[in-house]
């Protein structure tokens, strides 16, 4: 299980939201590329980067920060937020993004999902399944898709998706701990390589996730707020798991 630090970009700053609420955001840095450099120095290998403006269809706002992060860090980068057409996929491929995260498009545009799988290595195509009360949210978590996350996962498995990020939005940004039951059910029901996201507050949370008794081990865990608030030491977490 790998530990994946997160940077969420809003107006070119690193921020964290509380339960996905844009009205409850806290700014942590106006130089997010420096955060990425720090994560690399502390032993991380993969960065979870989210374009929050892009997720709301406010495209291009964070482009400079995304480029600078890609150019200045040795980390592999998985990027999501606003990837809803072939041109965006091609652009991110061109600038060296390692993995593309499709969220809204995975729900609303199965043809784009198929295109991504047909034209890029499966390892590079990740689907974000973001849910609250069992229902998938889209468009920056601001719209209800009406699709249950288990139904979406059934579709993704049939489509050939191998990698997903699952976020329990009710836990995200709360430091209240992960939804262990949900991850256990997913890992025992589906063939995906799963990355957990939402609620991480301590090394104990990471240990609890790594100790889940499942058919497939958890691939990774995303953590953001716990790092920024000093609740979790990244280097220690990486060496302990």
From Swiss-Prot:
Its main location: cytoplasm. It is an enzyme of class 5 (isomerase). It catalyses: 1-(5-phospho-beta-D-ribosyl)-5-[(5-phospho-beta-D-ribosylamino)methylideneamino]imidazole-4-carboxamide = 5-[(5-phospho-1-deoxy-D-ribulos-1-ylimino)methylamino]-1-(5-phospho-beta-D-ribosyl)imidazole-4-carboxamide. This is 1-(5-phosphoribosyl)-5-[(5-phosphoribosylamino)methylideneamino] imidazole-4-carboxamide isomerase. It comes from Leptospira borgpetersenii serovar Hardjo-bovis (strain L550). Pathway: Amino-acid biosynthesis; L-histidine biosynthesis; L-histidine from 5-phospho-alpha-D-ribose 1-diphosphate: step 4/9. One of its GO terms (molecular function) is 1-(5-phosphoribosyl)-5-[(5-phosphoribosylamino)methylideneamino]imidazole-4-carboxamide isomerase activity. GO terms for cellular component: cytoplasm. GO terms for biological process: L-histidine biosynthetic process; L-tryptophan biosynthetic process.
